[in-house]
């Protein structure tokens, strides 16, 4: 059990109006909270925001975590495109693999059709398209980097030509290099730059944003390792250490996005604990990506629903992430997720408008 202090925002409210000094804004987004769950050495207690200043004055880590949690995340300028993290964004998943668990490899043989599917997701509201050429399902075979490059580069080139923002979902430096040369703007690595010794160098040289995803033992693959004492704290500490390591190697901290790795080397109970405690991860000071779309946990909680019948569960998990202040949702079902976000945004706007009107009376 770690002896470090951790802060998890809790007790969320609809509006900050009339609550000066009693609530704090979460990461510059559309959520406000009234207290922290403070954990240290396995012990937890609740500290209201109104009383937090005293704790911050005597504990440097508490002050630093509070600053990270409440600071707005800087926008990412990617060519003529800008990703702003003051409200949730959607990343559309585009797999070009023969053994994809979600689409059965339908797009692997036809780069033009794959790119068209990506453009369609962008039209439906995806801020970027995440292109992957290697399956990360459990027991999936390792793909030779040359084959992976052949799968993804023609698709990325077409997407970029259409004006679509692209991230490359890979753990291999050679694939990162080829994808970035083809116009991809972001690296999304399920190994958090661990798998390939050259990966960090590629990201540093490109100066591109990178998604660092947690898995217990990335050198063994995305599903290597298992077993946690406190999964939420351990994932936080792992990502905190990984961020420090890649920043020391030259990665710009303002260009790091973190992903808790739902479904990667984690049991159903681990995944549920992570989702219920997601707000803790804002203490890392980075935008958070959540990839829970169509995951096995949805089937486990819904009478073993097959992959193509997990839309409801995917939306439920996306909304859980949104309520926790997640900035980027990685999903298969873009139109439905975007609609859910718009309805959520309408509810938020209505609560704020009503509170301002009441305050002016």
Range-by-range predicted roles:
Residues 57-69, 104-120:
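Histidine-rich, glycine-flanked metal-binding segment
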Residues 116-132, 324:
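Catalytic domains of carbohydrate-active enzymes, especially glycoside hydrolases
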Residues 1-30, 85, 100-117, 136-165, ...:
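Active-site-adjacent loop and "lid" segments of alpha/beta metabolic enzymes
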Residues 73-91:
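Glycine-rich, aromatic-flanked loop segments that form ligand/cofactor-binding clefts
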Residues 97:
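Flexible glycine-/small-residue-enriched beta->alpha junction loops
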Residues 1-79:
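N-terminal accessory interaction module
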């Amino acid at each position: 059990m770690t002896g470090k202090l951790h802060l998890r925002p809790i007790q969320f409210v609809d509006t900050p109006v009339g609550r000066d000094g009693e609530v704090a804004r979460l990461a510059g987004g559309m959520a406000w909270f009234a207290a922290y769950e403070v954990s240290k050495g396995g012990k937890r207690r609740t500290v209201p925001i109104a009383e937090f200043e005293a704790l911050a004055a005597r504990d440097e880590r508490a002050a630093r975590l509070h600053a990270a949690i409440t600071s707005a995340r800087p926008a990412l300028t990617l060519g003529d495109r800008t990703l702003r993290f003051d409200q949730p964004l959607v990343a559309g998943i585009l797999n070009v693999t023969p053994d994809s668990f979600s689409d059965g490899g339908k797009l692997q043989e036809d780069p033009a059709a794959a790119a068209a599917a990506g453009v369609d997701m962008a039209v439906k509201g995806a801020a970027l398209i995440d292109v992957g050429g290697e399956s990360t399902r459990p027991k999936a075979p390792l793909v030779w980097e040359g084959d992976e490059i052949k799968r993804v580069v023609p698709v990325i080139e077409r997407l970029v030509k259409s004006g679509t923002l692209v991230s490359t979902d890979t753990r291999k430096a050679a694939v990162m290099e080829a994808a970035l040369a083809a116009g991809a703007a972001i690296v999304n690595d399920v190994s958090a730059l661990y798998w390939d010794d050259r990966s960090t160098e590629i990201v540093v040289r490109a100066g591109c944003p990178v998604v660092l995803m947690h898995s217990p033992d990335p050198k063994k693959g995305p599903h290597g390792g298992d077993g946690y004492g406190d999964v939420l704290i351990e994932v936080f500490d792992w990502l905190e250490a990984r961020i420090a390591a890649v920043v020391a190697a030259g990665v710009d901290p303002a260009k790091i996005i973190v992903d808790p790795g739902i479904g990667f080397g984690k049991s159903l109970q681990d995944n549920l604990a992570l989702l219920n405690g997601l707000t803790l991860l804002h203490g890392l000071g980075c935008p958070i990506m959540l990839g829970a779309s169509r995951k096995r946990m949805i089937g486990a909680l819904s009478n073993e629903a097959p992959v193509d019948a997990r839309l409801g569960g995917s939306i439920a998990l996306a909304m859980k992430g949104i309520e926790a202040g997640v900035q980027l949702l990685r999903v298969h079902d873009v139109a439905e997720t975007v609609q859910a976000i718009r309805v959520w945004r309408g509810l938020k706007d209505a609560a704020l408008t009503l509170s301002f009107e009441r305050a002016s009376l």
